[in-house]
A protein has these predicted regions:
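Glycoside hydrolase catalytic-domain groove-lining segments
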Residues: 8, 157-212
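Solvent-exposed loop/turn segments at secondary-structure junctions
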Residues: 11-15, 86-91, 135-140, 166-171, ...
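Substrate-binding cleft of extracellular glycoside hydrolase catalytic domains
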Residues: 1-128, 132, 280-283, 288-295
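Substrate-binding cleft of secreted/luminal carbohydrate-active enzymes
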Residues: 80, 198-296
Length: 296
């Protein structure tokens, strides 16, 4: 209560359920590049072949937004962010460009999902906001150089926020330890120029433990950069989400966590970041306002 969830809508489902139009069972290709001549999930979505799944998701979100009285556009409505097909400019998801689909197909898929959610009554911008977030590739060079983020932009009518996912991999990858500014600034500048009227967000960021640098200091740097960054279009970062998880990446377990149940004070800089006056935490006594929800 008091917070607004952010739901990432990924364009794949469990093929064991028998849907020939869904993506692979595990979401990503088993080997990098495996998807390049096979995936056409963007086209399938745009052509309506996955509407039954999309509509079930839309109905679930509608029930959540409607609140206890189960009626939209009343005082007990809840707020939610929807993020369809994130990191589309990379090479690891089946909604990226392939031999069988283009960035235009992704745009059409994003718009189609938006329209299906509209169809169940989720049209009030006080309650639902859509986020478009490509990957900040930095020096990792994992992104597709032939299909840049701009080509995937669905348009101002369908997008309420723009942002980037950005990770400091440390020595887990060849890029080495990188500052928040290094991994975020260039990509934020880019999405700012693509959508100059939209508020900026970092829907995902993370830094691993024991990966060649000072994680606690990195959180201090994250606070500084996100608080003082101003885009070429004079926008500021209005929302930040941290990837507080442990996850296997290429067979190696990486500990991204800043807080966990065993020891939530390992990184005091993260706790300090979340408690600064210019951060709004959702809680029962301090509900996020509509203006804050919309990045105003």
């Amino acid at each position: 209560e008091g917070a607004a969830p952010l739901l990432t809508f990924e364009f794949f489902t469990n093929n064991k359920q028998g849907d020939p139009h869904a993506g692979p069972y595990d979401g990503a290709a088993k080997h990098k590049g495996d998807h390049e001549n096979t995936a056409r999930v963007d086209k399938n979505i745009a052509e309506g072949k996955l509407d039954s799944r999309i509509d079930r998701a839309a109905d679930t979100v509608r029930t959540f937004v409607a609140g206890p009285d189960n009626t939209l556009n009343t005082q007990d409505d809840r707020k939610v962010y929807i993020r369809p097909g994130h990191e589309m400019n990379g090479t690891w998801y089946r909604w990226s460009a392939t031999a069988n689909q283009t960035p235009t197909d992704y745009v059409n898929a994003f718009r189609h999902i938006h329209k299906r959610f509209d169809h169940v009554g989720l049209t009030n911008k006080d309650s639902i906001q859509y986020i478009w977030s490509p990957m900040s590739c930095g020096s990792i060079n994992d992104c597709d150089p032939t299909h840049l983020a701009r080509g995937y932009y669905p348009g101002d009518r369908y997008v309420d926020w723009v942002g980037v996912d950005a990770y400091n991999w440390g020595n887990a990858r060849s890029s080495g330890w990188q500052s928040p500014e290094t991994i975020m600034k260039q990509a934020l500048d880019e999405v700012s120029n693509i959508a100059p009227s939209k508020p900026l967000t970092i829907p995902e960021t993370g830094v691993p433990s024991n990966a060649g640098g000072d994680k606690n200091q990195w959180f201090n740097d994250l606070y500084g950069f996100t608080s003082y960054y101003i885009s070429p279009q004079k926008q500021r970062i209005k929302m930040l989400n941290y990837f507080n998880n442990k996850k296997k990446e290429d067979g190696t377990l990486i500990d991204w966590t800043a807080i966990n149940s065993a020891d939530d004070h390992r990184f005091p800089a993260f706790n300090s970041l979340a408690r600064h006056d210019n951060y709004i935490g959702g809680n029962k006594k301090n509900h996020i306002s509509t203006a804050q929800f919309q990045g105003r």
